[in-house]
Amino acid sequence: MKEFFPVLHTAALFSGISDEELAAMLSCLGARIDTFPKGSRLLRAGESVEEVGLVLAGSALIVQEDIWGNRSILSKTGPGQTFAEVFACAPGAVLNVSVEAESAVTVMFLHIRRVLSVCPSACSYHSRFIRNLLSELAEKNLRLNEKLTHISEH
């Protein structure tokens, strides 16, 4: 996993976290890495998730489909960016979007339950990670709010 540390350090989730802390944190969070070919679905609408996805290489699209099969690309995620964090943080929430590989994509999945509970090892960087997660959620919420404001004006 150390080969991905340069990308992880660009991620808002790991802002202010050293290499040593990062290595310990990835273990604590049950980090796993998967690679998906172009066009494959990483997550499907209708599923529930417990993991945050963080793109390490390649890109993924957040796509919403209506009942007639019309697709809307809501966002694109690239290296250092996350997806599914809102759904993973809300126990029992069901995805209303799918995540698709725009290109071949490598993703690190982090188990959200381990993020939201107190670490049994009392990791000093655990609270920093939670602050980073909240900051990222707030920024995405603000961007969504701006889009809604723009759409409602027309």
Language model segments and positions:
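Cyclic-nucleotide recognition modules
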Residues: 73-132
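Short phosphate-coordinating micro-motif centered on Lys-Gly-acidic
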Residues: 41-47
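Cyclic nucleotide-binding regulatory module and flanking cytosolic helices
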Residues: 1-38, 88-89, 150
